[in-house]
Amino acid sequence: MMFAGTKAAFNTFAGPQEFGRWYSARRDRSRACEAWIEQHDQILGYCDCCEAVVPLGVASGATFDHHPSLREGLICPQGLSGRARLVFRVVKWIGVVADGRLLDLILYEDLTPLRKAISRLPGVRAHCSLYHAEETSSGTAIVVNGNWTTHQDITASSYPDAAADIVMHCDVLEHIANYRAALAENLRILKPGGLLLFTAPFFVQQPQTQTLASQNSAGEITHLIPYPEYHADPVRGQILAYYRFGWSLLDDLRGAGFSGARALVEFDVFSGLTSNNNPYMDTGNMPPLMVVAMK
């Protein structure tokens, strides 16, 4: 029911052809809006977390050449970026339509503004964690920056089977060398009919996922591009990206046992939900996108 409702409430796509037809009618208008936004330090927009029209800070520090990343920018007063506010909007909507049921949500994230916002949602019981180190056992209590949290390995968590109505992670999967093992683990801990929701670098121009680096059984890493790609990480400072995902990621989800894997795209300029603002439309631009799949 939640999955069917999510498809009805948001624009979702099973493959590049239907997305391409939909996006071609919106691409130029979206880019014009983003060009206007990047000329300002802040804009006014509606935030689902703040439940009000609020100032959204345009720049976060992340840039493409001199263009600010609007995926990591457009930050609301509670600290949620455009990417995080998209996630919050979808989870909030699912909580509203859950008919009063308390939803168990496993979130592979902690100590962030998004985690705090999700934990305040009525009808959602959040179980949050961080990845600490390979030698740490999943389920172990750890201290990060003076705060207690729990270590969980997304490929081998300590959660029991069918523990969650929703499993969620945000820009985690690209950092997992064996990401298919993570998808299998996500499936294991979901209840039947439960939803997997996640963000990741998903490039709608790519039919296939691009592998940037690989890791052998001994843990040795081979870089497959001239300049390895690292992303900021709150625990380790920076972390290697192994993949730039394409539409084949949806096939991986179906192969793992999920049904109805789709890309959810939510353009809403008034709410600060835009593309990442990368000027290279054929290689680096990403729409405001999440992946959704059902067990």
Language model: regions and residue ranges:
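Short, charged, low-hydrophobicity "junction" segments
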Residues: 58-59, 97-102, 171, 186, ...
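N-terminal juxtadomain amphipathic helix
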Residues: 17-102
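S-adenosyl-L-methionine-dependent methyltransferase catalytic module, highlighting the catalytic core
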Residues: 7-25, 31-45, 180-294
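Conserved SAM-binding loop
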Residues: 100-217, 247-253, 289-294
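A generic local structural motif
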Residues: 90-95, 152-155, 183-184, 276-279
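Conserved phosphate-coordination/catalytic loops
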Residues: 85, 177, 244
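Glycine-rich, flexible loop segments associated with nucleotide phosphate handling
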Residues: 67-73, 141-153, 241-243, 281-289
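Extended, low-complexity, charged intrinsically disordered regions
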Residues: 3-4
